[in-house]
């Protein structure tokens, strides 16, 4: 299911003295089946943008097309419930939204709310908890007895149980240790590959954006600043830094090595493995250049 923004603008508290423009002139598409990352400095419009992906917010100008559904400025949209089943959103710290007595009831809440029978919802809960790498035995336990990482996986299972076509992730690894972050990101990538899920990731982690995303959208002051593959986007390193966007650690090391040893590494290096390989290649070719004094 493709999602397209056409000249989208969003203003909070529209037509009041407190009106504030959060998005403007946003033109971007997320074709079905892809893995995308949205990056940008705090306040660049990322969170406002993703709330348009399933109608939580509606544009004050322009149109958002979600599959065959058009959400346009000035039109009161009704029956958005089916849309929110197709586009599942995992907000920051989703475990804070857990509330039921058992893990099973929490995961079943979404499917039941969409009219699924109790028996079918329980089956979806069993499938979803295995998708997020947890044992079915946890279904009978209180979610509040689990570890923080387990609680987050339960909350994600609740979204997956609704079988969305698009999975939107807003800083999904925030607050987790490095091991937990890596496990969760690998889980999302596996779901993307095995289930054909379209994934839209909002992140401040440039390593994750570079590693997983096929296309990266850079937001700045409410509009799209850059869009392209990781190689294309991070080739604009100086411009990104000027607008407050961090760079992958490998690019920072690349610069430091070039300056320290007076060598030129022409290829973009988006992981430490790539950087190591490129440094070895340059040195084998006698890539040392005399440092200017």
Curated annotation (Swiss-Prot):
Function: ATP-binding (A) component of a common energy-coupling factor (ECF) ABC-transporter complex. Unlike classic ABC transporters this ECF transporter provides the energy necessary to transport a number of different substrates.
Species for this entry: Bacillus thuringiensis (strain Al Hakam)
Keywords: ATP-binding, Cell membrane, Membrane, Nucleotide-binding, Translocase, Transport
PANTHER family per UniProt: ENERGY-COUPLING FACTOR TRANSPORTER ATP-BINDING PROTEIN ECFA2, HEAVY METAL TRANSPORTER
First-level EC class: translocase
A Pfam short name: ABC_tran
Name of the protein in question: Energy-coupling factor transporter ATP-binding protein EcfA2
SMART domains reported in the protein's UniProt record: AAA
InterPro entries on file: AAA+_ATPase, ABC_transporter-like_ATP-bd, ABC_transporter-like_CS, ABC_transpr_CbiO/EcfA_su, ECF_ABC_transporter_ATP-bd, EcfA2, P-loop_NTPase
Gene Ontology, cellular component aspect: ATP-binding cassette (ABC) transporter complex
Keyword Transport: yes
GO function terms (MF aspect): ATP binding; ATP hydrolysis activity; ATPase-coupled transmembrane transporter activity
Residue sites binding ATP per the record: 40-47
Subunit structure as annotated in this protein's UniProt entry: Forms a stable energy-coupling factor (ECF) transporter complex composed of 2 membrane-embedded substrate-binding proteins (S component), 2 ATP-binding proteins (A component) and 2 transmembrane proteins (T component).
Family affiliation: Belongs to the ABC transporter superfamily. Energy-coupling factor EcfA family.
Bilayer topology annotation: Peripheral membrane protein
Gene3D superfamilies in the record: P-loop containing nucleotide triphosphate hydrolases
Domain annotation ABC transporter: ranges: 3-246
């Amino acid at each position: 299911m493709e999602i397209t923004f056409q000249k989208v603008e969003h203003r909070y508290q529209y037509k009041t003295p407190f009106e504030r423009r959060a998005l403007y002139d946003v033109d971007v598409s997320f074709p079905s089946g892809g893995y995308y990352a949205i990056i940008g400095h705090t306040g660049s419009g990322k969170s406002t943008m993703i709330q348009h992906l399933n109608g939580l917010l509606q544009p004050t100008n322009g149109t958002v097309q979600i599959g065959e559904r058009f959400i346009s400025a000035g039109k009161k949209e009704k029956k958005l419930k089916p849309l929110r089943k197709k586009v599942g959103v995992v907000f920051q710290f989703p475990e804070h939204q857990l509330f039921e007595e058992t893990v099973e009831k929490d995961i079943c809440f979404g499917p039941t709310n969409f009219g699924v029978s109790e028996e079918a919802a329980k089956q979806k809960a069993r499938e979803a908890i295995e998708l997020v790498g947890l044992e079915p035995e946890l279904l009978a336990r209180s979610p509040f007895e689990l570890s923080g990482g387990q609680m987050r996986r339960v909350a994600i299972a609740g979204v997956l149980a609704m079988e969305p076509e698009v999975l939107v992730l807003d800083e999904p690894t925030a607050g987790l240790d490095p091991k937990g972050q890596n496990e969760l990101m690998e889980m999302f990538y596996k779901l993307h590959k095995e289930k054909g899920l379209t994934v839209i990731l909002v992140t401040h982690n440039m390593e994750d954006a570079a590693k997983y995303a096929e296309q990266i959208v850079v937001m700045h002051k409410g509009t799209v600043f850059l869009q392209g593959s990781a190689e294309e986007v991070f080739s604009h390193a100086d411009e990104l830094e000027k607008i407050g966007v961090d760079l992958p650690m490998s690019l920072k090391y690349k610069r430091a090595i070039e300056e320290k040893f007076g060598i030129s590494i022409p290829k973009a290096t988006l992981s430490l493995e790539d950087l190591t390989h490129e440094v070895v290649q340059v040195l084998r070719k006698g890539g040392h250049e005399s440092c200017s004094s």
